[in-house]
Amino acid sequence: MTLFKRAIAMTYRINEFEFALPDAELQDSSINILKFPTLDTTLIISRSFLADDETLHSNFDAQLKRLEQQVSNLRYQPVQRVRVGTKYEVEALELRSQFSKAADEVYQFQLALVLPSTRKMLALSYVKAQALGAAEAEHWSRIKLSLTFDGVQ
């Protein structure tokens, strides 16, 4: 008779279903892409982990420098420190930018944050192929202020 040691599984949830992961050692680097047809905008949410020697600011600056190398006509407003969430409980960095990539114009709001007491970084990019107006700014603001963080008080 062979005995199998049963490891504690982690349940991973997405909108459509959840599933058990047999190994709890996991780094979620997934990306979600949500489209809003009425405003013709897209929200991209990406996850990553900061290296031991990185801060939110240093990572954000490095990503901005990489973006400068990959696109043309990059213009952006100064990076702002903001607080987000339903209780304004998480500090984040926000940037409004526009650039050209190939024949496409890209206009975006970007937000980066590190979940408290972790090294997990989340980046949200709210993107449109035309200039962002008041309706898009309001939509973006509502998204930022509605963030509810698991385990953050």
Annotate each predicted stretch with a short phrase.
Residues T2-A9, E16-L26, A123-Q153:
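Surface-exposed amphipathic alpha-helical segments
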Residues A9-A62:
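Secretory pathway targeting signatures of secreted, lumenal, and periplasmic proteins
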Residues L64-L115:
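Signature of long, low-cysteine stretches enriched in small and polar/charged residues
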Residues L39-I44, E91-A92, R119-S125:
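Glycine-rich, often proline-containing surface loops adjacent to acidic residues and nearby aromatics
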Residues T2-L3, F36-L39, R81:
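Acidic (Asp/Glu-rich) sequence patches and key acidic residues
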Residues S48-A51, S100, P116-T118, Y126-A131:
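Short, flexible beta-strand-to-coil junctions
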Residues T11, A20-S29, E68-V84, F149-D150:
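Short secondary-structure junctions
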Residues K35-P37, A112-T118:
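Short glycine/proline-enriched loop/turn "hinge" motifs that connect secondary-structure elements
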